[in-house]
């Protein structure tokens, strides 16, 4: 006997992927998330491919995962996908100490962040 299946929190035309423990500050990750918010999935992938930000590689992985979830788990058409939401959350902050002059030490903060990407299938517009 297993637990009853939980209701989906997303509508039927949406799929999501979450990347956790990304070793970057949430502010820097949000700069890259702003690039893809509201874009078509194919255009967002192209933007991330040529972005010079280090974290863009991990954001691209997460977006590809969301697209794969949409295609394989929810039977959505990949060509009609749009990045409806891309939001960033705070993770843990590792604290380290660095030696300074005169026998003192300084704190170094190493923040982590989380990224959630939700893709939505929109109806293809009929070209007239």
From Swiss-Prot:
SUPFAM superfamilies from the UniProt entry: Ribosomal protein L22
UniProt keyword annotations, A-Z: Ribonucleoprotein, Ribosomal protein, RNA-binding, rRNA-binding
A GO BP annotation: translation
Stretch forming the signal peptide: none
Gene3D superfamilies reported for this sequence: Ribosomal protein L22/L17
Transmembrane segments: none
GO cellular component: cytosolic large ribosomal subunit
Top-rank lineage group of the source organism: Bacteria
One MF term in the entry's GO annotations: rRNA binding
Similarity comment: Belongs to the universal ribosomal protein uL22 family.
Quaternary organization: Part of the 50S ribosomal subunit.
NCBIfam families: rplV_bact
Function: This protein binds specifically to 23S rRNA; its binding is stimulated by other ribosomal proteins, e.g. L4, L17, and L20. It is important during the early stages of 50S assembly. It makes multiple contacts with different domains of the 23S rRNA in the assembled 50S subunit and ribosome.
Name listed for the protein in its UniProt record: Large ribosomal subunit protein uL22
Species, as recorded: Rhodopseudomonas palustris (strain BisA53)
């Amino acid at each position: 006997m297993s637990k009853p299946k939980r209701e989906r929190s997303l509508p039927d035309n949406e799929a999501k992927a979450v990347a956790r423990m990304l070793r970057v500050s949430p502010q820097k990750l949000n700069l890259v998330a702003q690039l893809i918010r509201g874009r078509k999935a194919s255009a967002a992938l192209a933007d991330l491919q040529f972005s010079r930000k280090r974290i863009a590689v991990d954001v691209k992985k997460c977006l590809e995962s969301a697209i794969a979830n949409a295609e394989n788990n929810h039977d959505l058409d990949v060509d009609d996908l749009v990045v409806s939401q891309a939001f960033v959350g705070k993770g843990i902050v590792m604290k380290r100490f660095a030696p300074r002059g005169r026998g003192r030490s300084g704190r170094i903060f190493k923040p982590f962040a989380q990224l959630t990407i939700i893709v939505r299938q929109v109806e293809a517009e009929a070209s007239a």
